[in-house]
Structure formats: C-alpha cells, structure tokens
C-alpha cells in the first residue's frame, strides 16, 4: 500500500487485505476498518463524520463496499450517507431511521466538538453537525455469514452497550472486531438508559469463549489487543456476577487491561 498522508485520518495496514482508518485527533480515538475480499469489501463503521471517510476508502480499494454498522451511535455512523449499501442489526433499524430516543442533538454536538487536537476540514462545524439518519440496505441477525470472496465474516449479536450492537468474526485471519464491547484505556459504557449491564456481561462472556483468535480490534483507543485479554474478561464476568455488580449505578469496575462502567 502506498502511504496515505491525510490531515484527519490515519491509515494503518493490518495486513494487505485489512486496514484501520483512525481518527486520533478526536478524544474518542475512533477506528473504522476496511476488509477486502476477492469480490467486494466491507467497511466496519464510518467514523465520526468530522471528515468523509469515503475519500480514504476510495484510495484503498476499487471494490464495491458494504458498510457494516457495529451500532448506531453517532461516532460510528458519521459517513454513512456517503455509501449506498448500509447494514445494521435488526434491533437498531429504528434508531438508524429516526435517531436515538432522548439523546439530544445538543449533547451530540457538544461531544463531537470537544477535545479536538488536529485541524478539522472547513466543512466541519459542530453547531450544525447532524448524525446520519436513513433506511438501511439490509438487516443483520446473529449468525449471519457474509462472504466477500475467499473471506467469510460472521455476525455476532453482542448487545449491552446498545441493543443491536454486533461484533464481527473474520474467519480467514482470526480477527475479532468488537466495536464498543471491548477496548482499553477508557471505560466500556453500559450506564445510559439505552444500555443493559446484564446484556453487556453476557456478550463479554460470549466473546470470551471464542477460540483461535489472533487479534481483537475494538473501535476506540489501542489498535489491536492480544486475545489473552479474554482470560481477564472471563475473570471479570465471574467477579461482577458473584459480587452483584451487574446493575446500573455500581460505578467503574477496573480489570487488567480494561474497565467497565455501569
């Protein structure tokens, strides 16, 4: 890959068929992922929407791109409007079309506009920022398999952070893309009214039982975690349940390599 020098996005080659497109100039440190097959490509999320991620994806591939949405939070659907083929879990179709109930545009604009450390494009103005809303091209469910040509991706329904949150298992390379289910450096959030502590812990248990993983890619902060973190996830699940902590209001729980806030 020829090096892409971009003012906003950072492109990192994971392998010659997998790229991270990151937004390190924002406090969220968001990662989107472009996965190439022989017939088509998948873009896991489209970032913050501060700049148009399609400008980067076009430089990386000429394959037709399907956008797979880990969940319908504003920092993951920012450039959805630039793509024709958008897929979302069935439990968040309504959010994609109508927005998230009781999440004010004022709160979103405050969050998207704060703690920015890189120059933003002239087209970005937090005061008129609006998250994408629209109809998906297709609906995803747990167990769906997407074949992009000599590369199969399994959809895992992993709710908790949001009701229709999904993770993706890349069978070819053993990669697990966890969205906002698992990452480091900041708490995994399950304290909003639209979250579920019980579902989050069940989802963590679900991915902790996966085998033959080579790398875990969360959507924020450190790019690529060692699968050994799942041993700590298993311990965390037991600790949280045994101490009756899996409920709203119990605060931040810190473990080796990650933390969770209920």
Task: Briefly describe each language-model feature range.
Residues 41, 48-49, 138, 145, ...:
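Metallo-beta-lactamase
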Residues 13-19, 124-128, 149-151:
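Short Pro/Gly-enriched beta-strand edge/turn motifs at strand-loop
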